[in-house]
């Protein structure tokens, strides 16, 4: 035990240290306070280290001596005087040592003599050493505020008990009671409701004073809950504290998420549905509809010329007796066509636009025209009955001749029609040939 403090002083002034090792210095103070008899050996080691030629060892010895004077009391003050450390320090300053060593010695001497009351104080030896250097014309560094409270009395057992008691009271103050847990739950509910009503398009609303205060309260409650969980032995209080901690974490996490989303271009309610893409699509739909309508109109306008019958085509039907050409009304052009009476409401000889009629009237009119046409010569009996029926009902074909005489295959180039007399002559010749061939067949069979 007698060598513990001395060995600690050796380690505190080891030249391998970069700077003062405060853990070793405090350990040295504890050893001397537990056994004041070891102070003598420790001061002896420090005196030896102070006379070293290595400035690093000297500065380490001065720091260790300063630590002992602040923490070990009257025994060390007297040992510094008795061991002649004050005279050694004055000699070192007069020899002009390293600047840091010189400044440290001057600061210690000035602080000590001021703390002990100067010339008329308890230890006038400190003042004498100070005055000796001052008389030699050596300027002392200016005093600092830390030098005024240089000495601190050694800590005693009652003080330690008081510190422990204060620490326990602080822990009790930071814990939570059942009433405070209920109050914290109310704060959590209010903050959750306010975050639920938060407008994502207005991130500044999170900076409202009420929300800021509630968030701060919740964070304070969270710290106190952690202290409660780690210290309490009440199971009911522990369960409620854990439940409160979960709610606090949930609401604070939601607040942080909203704050993070608001700080970045967010996809909040207003920013998540920007209209530009939809507006562009709608405009494109309108343009497509308009273009489709225009295309349909152009298609209808161009469909009539492309469907015009070519000369010599079989699209029309010719009445052999009258020589007139009949066309189905669906394929006929609106120009130059005179409709049979009664005229339809959409017929106009001067209109250049296409006429769109319903399919059912066109089909009925076309079928009516087809029924008025005679059968082909190959069907002789039906053709003869058709002519007899027509002569008996109308007496002549003059009405159809008058109605269809001016019909043409195309509106631009009227077709050259054959004379009715020629057509009638051809039809009669063909009819006579048919009768003669049938008569010959009958004679052969007889």
UniProtKB/Swiss-Prot annotation:
User: Any keyword Disulfide bond?
Assistant: no
Q: Where in the cell is it found?
A: Cytoplasm; Membrane
Stretches of Low complexity bias are at 347-361
Which stretches does UniProt call biased (Polar residues)?
A: 400-413
> Which CDD domains does this chain map to?
GAT_GGA-like_plant, VHS
Instruction: Please identify the protein, giving its name as recorded.
Output: TOM1-like protein 4
Q: Which gene encodes it?
A: TOL4
Q: One GO CC annotation, please?
A: membrane
Q: Please provide the record's keywords in A-Z order.
A: Cytoplasm, Membrane, Phosphoprotein, Protein transport, Transport
């Amino acid at each position: 035990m007698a060598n513990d403090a001395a060995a600690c002083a050796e380690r505190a002034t080891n030249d391998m240290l970069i700077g003062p090792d405060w853990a070793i210095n405090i350990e040295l103070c504890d050893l001397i306070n537990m056994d004041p008899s070891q102070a003598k050996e420790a001061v002896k080691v420090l005196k030896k280290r102070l006379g070293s030629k290595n400035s690093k060892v000297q500065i380490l010895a001065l720091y260790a001596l300063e630590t002992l004077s602040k923490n070990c009391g009257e025994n060390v003050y007297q040992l510094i005087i008795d061991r002649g450390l004050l005279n050694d320090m004055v000699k070192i300053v007069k020899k002009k040592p390293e600047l840091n060593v010189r400044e440290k010695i001057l600061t210690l001497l000035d602080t000590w003599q001021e703390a002990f009351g100067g010339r008329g104080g308890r230890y006038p030896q400190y003042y004498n050493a100070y005055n000796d250097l001052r008389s030699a014309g050596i300027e002392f560094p200016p005093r600092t505020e830390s030098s005024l409270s240089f000495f601190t009395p050694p800590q005693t057992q009652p003080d330690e008990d008081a510190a422990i008691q204060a620490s326990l009271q602080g822990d009790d103050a930071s814990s939570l009671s059942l009433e405070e847990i209920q109050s914290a739950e109310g704060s959590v509910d209010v903050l959750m409701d306010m975050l639920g009503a938060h407008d994502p398009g207005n991130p500044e609303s999170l900076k409202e004073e009420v929300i800021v205060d509630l968030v701060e309260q919740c964070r304070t409650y969270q710290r106190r809950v952690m202290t409660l969980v780690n210290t309490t032995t009440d199971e009911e209080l522990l369960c409620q504290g854990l439940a409160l901690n979960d709610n606090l974490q949930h609401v604070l996490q939601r607040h942080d998420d909203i704050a993070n989303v608001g700080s970045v271009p967010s996809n909040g309610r207003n920013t998540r549905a920007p209209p530009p893409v939809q507006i562009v699509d709608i405009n494109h739909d309108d343009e497509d509809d308009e273009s489709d309508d225009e295309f349909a109109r152009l298609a209808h306008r161009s469909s009539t010329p492309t469907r015009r019958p070519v000369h010599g085509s079989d699209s029309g039907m010719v009445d052999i007796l009258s020589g007139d050409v009949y066309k189905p009304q669906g394929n006929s052009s609106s120009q130059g066509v005179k409709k049979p009476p009664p005229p339809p409401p959409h017929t106009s000889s001067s209109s250049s636009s296409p006429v769109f009629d319903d399919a059912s009237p066109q089909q009925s009119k076309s079928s009516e025209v087809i029924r008025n046409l005679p059968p082909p010569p190959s069907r002789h009996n039906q053709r003869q009955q058709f002519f007899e029926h027509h002569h008996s009902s109308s007496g002549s074909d003059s009405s159809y001749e008058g109605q269809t005489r001016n019909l043409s295959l195309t509106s631009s180039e009227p077709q050259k029609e054959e004379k009715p007399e020629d057509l009638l002559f051809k039809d009669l010749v063909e009819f006579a040939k048919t009768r003669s061939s049938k008569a010959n067949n009958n004679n052969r069979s007889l």
